[in-house]
UniProtKB/Swiss-Prot annotation:
Role summary: Aminopeptidase that plays a central role in peptide trimming, a step required for the generation of most HLA class I-binding peptides. Peptide trimming is essential to customize longer precursor peptides to fit them to the correct length required for presentation on MHC class I molecules. Strongly prefers substrates 9-16 residues long. Rapidly degrades 13-mer to a 9-mer and then stops. Preferentially hydrolyzes the residue Leu and peptides with a hydrophobic C-terminus, while it has weak activity toward peptides with charged C-terminus. May play a role in the inactivation of peptide hormones.
Protein species of origin: Homo sapiens
Membrane-spanning intervals of the chain: 2-21
Post-translational modification: N-glycosylated.
Stated name of the protein: Endoplasmic reticulum aminopeptidase 1
Family label: Belongs to the peptidase M1 family.
One GO CC term, this protein: membrane
Subunit details: Monomer. May also exist as a heterodimer; with ERAP2. Interacts with RBMX.
Glycosylation positions in this chain: N70, N154, N414, N760, N901
Record has Iron as a keyword: no
UniProt binding sites for substrate: E183, G317, A318, M319, E320, N321
Catalytic residues of the enzyme: E354 (proton acceptor)
């Protein structure tokens, strides 16, 4: 599943632009072990099970599902037939059911003339989302039984389970469809089932529908028959063995376009009829990517078809249901005339992510949600591996390390968690869908590939997939597969891989020791956080020290953590990558000669940050100001990031970090510029929350002066590579938002002409965001933009307008946006988390956003689910730029009052830590920034 993280942009679905858009706009509930008595029937029969996890002695083998949804009454009924076996005698069958009305349950045994069917007594435990079926006599070990359950339910008004979605045609007609979103624990909302990933089974699915509708599911349609009342019953082929959360079905009036891969797999994209002309790009990308994965994994895609469906109402970014992946429209549909370059990048990466899941996650699935990263970390990592080959023009490899910085931002907090961490209840499970599971997971895999070599790493994961196909795995299963490729005894592994002699190194450490992958990677998956590596150069001796990097403390936290850190470095004397495996707290390596500078973590391929003691930072700052291209753009971006992260823990002064940033005046590459903005913009956002207007204004002016030359070079066109176009879009937006008059005047001219054409003038896509942001500042412009928003068929255009509308300084209009997006009539509720956060970043809007969150909390967690990434996004988006003690006390007071309805959410702990960090940071650095802004070096800019 692609979740939409805190730093998101629905306008682009791009991991790159997300953080900048947000910046420019201006543990868990305690119900996993219930203390209340188990529920009882009216006759006093108690519920026979008191754990969240299901017992393991009843095993599902095959499901036969019949579901009929009425899109007029918004209800559905169904029959679930589950073939089961028992591994021990039992008269109790425990499975999941949530918000379903069970009308009858029976147990079938035997076959032919000896077939018998007995009624089962049904007990419900709503709090645990379980039902118990009590048989009149114990089930016998090894014999086949079939449980038959008749039930009914209402189509969900949320974004999970079997839920209602709507859209309007060009003519304004409202149409209704029904779709599913089961991951992680919502299959139980559509049919009673053993809703845990380890209970894999096959599925036969039948859907009843009206003739005017179309039904699709995981497998191809086998036949359709007419049944009572003129309804059509679609029978779909039997699935492969899979987890319940991967089941999917959609009843709609969608249309589709299709192509066939080289291996004969039919790939189709489904969308509402008015938008099917936007499906071609995703279709071509899906075909290419599916073919790539079949070749890379050396395992054929096991299903005969792969559908991709754009759902009008969708909470996350996308979902990997086997054979029927589902997406937000903005994550799948590409309008050649109006979609941005970053939208193309985002769509490509999202499709790559979901198709990677067809192997990582679907074919091989984590045993339990504590190892979710085995699914999501791999899928995130494979996005970059695949797209770098299938779409080289996108140059996605340059952007990978940005995901590591995103992960580090939350992993630096005490409230972070290990990549693999225990979870039990649904809210805890939902909280696992975060930057640590996705981005840190991907980053440590990339680090491992860099350490082992690409070929050895590939061989290891192919063996992992082949060995565990249609099964479930734990952390150690992956390391065991890697270990078989790379033995720990120092002997060359399979096919000669893992021989360290293939790497040049100034150190014997890398050569002589065996590659103990499991021991090494356990330090990265079983410990939270990441190391700070401190480098001290004494002549030819390089002293290295590792400690746990954690914000909120000027000293290293006393966690006792040690990592096996595969260090890489280059020097002023050699651009060859040198390698050193640091397994102890301190170590020393000896260079062949003295050097002027040394740069560790080459290309940001390692998940750690580096501090250079003594004059180390001065040397690197001088290098950047003199010949910044002496190191790669990724290395330049990582230096910017590391410098400002060190300010947070008191290892480097804010003046030195700001001095380093001055080199950006000569920078032209996207990643260093974006990283510079990611570090500098939050500084004045913190000032906004303290009403420090004078210094805030000076800082914004400094930022524009710093990048003015690059801004002035931007053309108001759609020319150039994807990275050049994304850089243009963000620089022009930055300039216009900060009232840089050459930009504002040009944007005003474009907006005036666009408005005079009634929105028919074709604007350059790359400048549209800046044009709309300027146009929305007037009441007339805002109203015109909203009128166009209502009827636009382009996801990119709608999101660009949405962004602009949230930029207004009119509080009444901001409040209206909050109210209407929450209602969902005029603006879809799926947009609400983004709108709330955009308004939370608006200097005049953030009090409105914070008040709205508090006032509507109970409704929000009902709609978006406690523990979901959407709830985390809203909590962090409305509060994590607060920088005063008054706001901190407000935040603490509100969330503590929620008790089990949110007080222990990880995002709440994160935002409290972040606000405390903001307060401390401002107290220590604000006066220094004020003085620095008046320094002579700035006068010479």
């Amino acid at each position: 599943m692609v979740f939409l993280p805190l730093k998101w942009s629905l306008a682009t679905m791009s991991f790159l632009l997300s953080s900048l858009l947000a910046l420019l706009t201006v543990s868990t509930p305690s119900w996993c072990q219930s203390t209340e008595a188990s529920p009882k029937r009216s006759d006093g029969t108690p519920f026979p099970w008191n754990k969240i996890r299901l017992p393991e002695y009843v095993i599902p083998v095959h499901y036969d599902l019949l579901i009929h949804a009425n899109l007029t009454t918004l209800t559905f009924w169904g029959t679930t037939k589950v073939e089961i076996t028992a591994s021990q005698p039992t008269s109790t069958i425990i499975l999941h059911s949530h918000h379903l009305q069970i009308s009858r349950a029976t147990l079938r045994k035997g076959a032919g003339e000896r077939l018998s069917e007995e009624p089962l007594q049904v007990l419900e435990h709503p709090r645990q989302e379980q039902i118990a079926l009590l048989a009149p006599e114990p089930l016998l070990v090894g014999l086949p039984y079939t449980v038959v359950i008749h039930y009914a339910g209402n189509l969900s008004e949320t974004f999970h389970g079997f839920y209602k979605s709507t859209y309007r045609t060009k003519e304004g007609e409202l149409r209704i469809l029904a779709s599913t979103q089961f991951e992680p624990t919502a299959a139980r909302m559509a049919f009673p089932c053993f809703d845990e990933p380890a209970f894999k089974a096959s599925f036969s699915i039948k859907i009843r529908r009206e003739p005017r509708h179309l039904a699709i599911s995981n497998m191809p349609l086998v036949k359709s028959v007419t049944v009572a009342e003129g309804l059509i019953e679609d029978h779909f082929d039997v699935t492969v063995k899979m987890s319940t959360y991967l089941v999917a079905f959609i009843i709609s009036d969608f249309e589709s376009v299709s192509k066939i891969t080289k291996s004969g797999v039919k790939v189709s994209v489904y969308a509402v009829p008015d938008k099917i002309n936007q499906a071609d790009y995703a279709l071509d990308a899906a075909v290419t990517l599916l073919e790539f994965y079949e070749d890379y994994f050396s395992i054929p895609y096991p299903l005969p078809k792969q559908d991709l469906a754009a759902i009008p109402d969708f909470q996350s970014g996308a979902m990997e249901n086997w054979g029927l992946t589902t997406y937000r429209e903005s994550a799948l549909l590409f309008d050649a005339e109006k979609s941005s370059a970053s939208s193309k990048l985002g769509i490509t990466m999202t499709v790559a992510h979901e198709l990677a899941h067809q192997w990582f996650g679907n074919l091989v699935t984590m045993e339990w949600w504590n190892d979710l990263w085995l699914n999501e970390g791999f899928a995130k990592f494979m996005e970059f591996v695949s797209v770098s080959v299938t779409h080289p023009e996108l140059k996605v490899g340059d952007y990978f390390f940005g995901k590591c910085f995103d992960a580090m931002e939350v992993d630096a907090l005490n409230s972070s968690h290990p990549v693999s961490t225990p979870v039990e209840n649904p809210a805890q499970i939902r909280e696992m869908f975060d930057d640590v599971s996705y981005d840190k997971g991907a980053c440590i895999l990339n680090m491992l590939r860099e350490y082992l070599s690409a070929d050895a790493f590939k061989s290891g994961i192919v063996q992992y997939l082949q060995k565990h196909s249609y099964k479930n795995t734990k952390n150690e299963d992956l390391w065991d597969s890697m270990a078989s490729i790379c033995p720990t005894d120092g002997v060359k592994g399979m096919d000669g891989f893992c021989s360290r002699s293939q790497h040049s190194s100034s150190s014997s450490h890398w050569h002589q020791e065996g590659v103990d992958v499991k021991t090494m990677m356990n330090t990265w998956t079983l410990q939270k956080g990441f190391p700070l590596i401190t480098i001290t150069v004494r002549g030819r001796n390089v002293h290295m020290k590792q400690e746990h990097y954690m914000k909120g403390s000027d000293g290293a936290p006393d966690t006792g953590y040690l990592w096996h850190v595969p260090l890489t470095f280059i020097t002023s004397k050699s651009d060859m990558v040198h390698r050193f495996l640091l397994k102890t707290k301190t170590d020393v390596l000896i260079l062949p000669e003295e050097v002027e500078w040394i740069k560790f973590n080459v290309g940001m391929n390692g998940y750690y940050i580096v501090h250079y003691e003594d004059d180390g930072w001065d040397s690197l700052t001088g290098l950047l100001k003199g010949t910044h291209t002496a190191v790669s753009s990724n290395d330049r971006a990582s230096l910017i990031n590391n410098a400002f992260q060190l300010v947070s823990i008191g290892k480097l002064s804010i003046e030195k970090a700001l001095d380093l940033s001055l080199y950006l005046k000569h920078e032209t590459e996207i990643m260093p510029v974006f990283q510079g903005l990611n570090e500098l913009i939050p500084m004045y956002k913190l000032m906004e929350k303290r009403d420090m207007n004078e210094v805030e204004t000076q800082f914004k002016a400094f930022l524009i002066r710093l990048l003015r030359d690059l801004i002035d070079k931007q053309t108001w066109t759609d020319e150039g590579s994807v990275s050049e176009r994304m850089l243009r879009s963000q620089l022009l937006l930055l300039a216009c938002v900060h009232n840089y008059q050459p930009c504002v005047q040009r944007a005003e001219g474009y907006f005036r002409k666009w408005k005079e054409s009634n929105g028919n003038l074709s604007l350059p896509v790359d400048v549209t965001l800046a044009v709309f942001a300027v146009g929305a500042q007037s009441t007339e412009g805002w109203d015109f933009l909203y009128s166009k928003y209502q009827f636009s068929l382009s996801s990119t255009e709608k999101s660009q307008i949405e962004f602009a509308l949230c930029r207004t300084q009119n509080k009444e209009k901001l409040q209206w946006l909050l109210d209407e997006s929450f209602k969902g009539d005029k603006i879809k509720t799926q947009e609400f988390p983004q709108i709330l956060t955009l308004i939370g970043r608006n200097p005049v809007g953030y009090p409105l956003a914070w008040q709205f969150l508090r006032k509507n909390w109970n409704k929000l967690v009902q709609k978006f689910e406690l523990g979901s990434s959407s709830i985390a996004h809203m909590v962090m988006g409305t509060t994590n730029q607060f920088s005063t003690r008054t706001r901190l006390e407000e935040v603490k007071g509100f969330f503590s009052s929620l008790k089990e309805n949110g007080s222990q959410l990880r995002c709440v702990q994160q935002t409290i830590e972040t606000i405390e960090e903001n307060i401390g940071w401002m107290d220590k650095n604000f006066d220094k920034i004020r003085v620095w802004l008046q320094s002579e070096k700035l006068e010479r800019m």
